Amino acid sequence: MTTQKQHQQQHHLQSGQEKNKALTLIICVCGLYGTFLTWSILQERINTKPYGDNNEYFKAPIIINLIQALFASIIGFIYNYVTTTTTSTKTTTKTKTKTNSNPFSIFFTNGKQNCNVLKFMILISITSSIASPIGYKSLKHLDYLAYLLAKSCKLIPVMIVHFIFYQTKFPNYKYLVAGLVTLGVILFTMAHVTTKTKINDGNTLLGLTYLIGSMILDGLTNSTQDQLFKLPLENKLTSGKLMSLLNLFIFIWTSLYTIIFHKYEIDYTINFINNYPELLIDIIGFAICGAIGQVFIFIILEKFDSIILITATVTRKMLSMILSVILFGHHLSWEQWVGVGLVFGGIGLEAFIKFKQQSQQKMKIKSKVA
């Protein structure tokens, strides 16, 4: 009888844990959709749509990046404090010394690796600081949907950087995915080359140059970030520490660059906001949504399989494109729809193969245990 009761209690406990996990996943996915769909709409609104009766366009992308980094850093510090405090209450006093809630401690408590941590953090923040404004510059010459489509696949820039700097070889399916995505983006962009607006001058070649440069910098950022996480650190670099410190560095570099070389953008932004106060609401909303969205990404990565994050991210980007078409009146030709299909088909193929690989690994582990 005692054994049967123990089995029942264990079953109820597992059932409760599964329900809590499912509820957490639903909240995180809904949060991811809600924040990043809003973020995407505001991004297009700020960068490509006119304000006021005079139809003035906001042309200070560095300021957008500056404000986004500030809010992401603040929310990152809050997220880091909450997660480290929660973790500390569940650990012993011995472990508490290693779970330091001060994110700056990673620069002083890792012995010989202190310099490497600082070096990688500076490099990541610089490449990230440059990538975003260059990407926004491409919007002067390309449609927002082309920008969104190209940014939907992070595999290509990562492959380019690894090939150039590390001579890395990839599985054959990744070359197929990269080919499908590249073909899709080119088809989508070139099929709409004749269309231009006041904000889009139709100079597709220049726009693609900016976009490719931004994507390569994204790849360098992601690859260097991978190297940072591989460092043997005693005081581990958590997602909260990375988010808070990285965005703080981006804010510092962008502030210095703006003050030294683009001080006029500060005055321009202040005057623009005085004339069109709704811009300030849009930028703050954009920054907050992006920062909170990052937190949901980290929670999903920490508590669930990466395949769940990939699936949620891909479907979110598809919804972003659909919302952009509906809300901002984009008209896509059949060639562009084929391009969209190729891009998301390639991303979907990558997700499917990763899912199969994970399933096979789990089956092997189970067979070894049995």
Curated annotation (Swiss-Prot):
Highest taxon listed in the record's lineage: Eukaryota
Q: Look up keyword Membrane and say if it applies.
A: yes
Name where it's found: Endoplasmic reticulum membrane
What's its membrane topology? Multi-pass membrane protein
Q: Name one GO biological process term.
A: UDP-glucose transmembrane transport into endoplasmic reticulum
What keywords does the record list, in alphabetical order? Endoplasmic reticulum, Membrane, Sugar transport, Transmembrane, Transmembrane helix, Transport
In the record, the note on similarity to other proteins reads:
Belongs to the nucleotide-sugar transporter family. SLC35B subfamily.
Q: Does the keyword rRNA processing apply?
A: no
Which gene underlies this protein? HUT1
Where are its TM segments located?
A: 22-42, 62-82, 115-135, 145-165, 175-195, 204-224, 242-262, 280-300, 307-327, 333-353
| An example Gene Ontology molecular-function term | UDP-glucose transmembrane transporter activity
Entry's Pfam families? Answer: UAA
What name goes with this protein? UDP-galactose transporter homolog 1
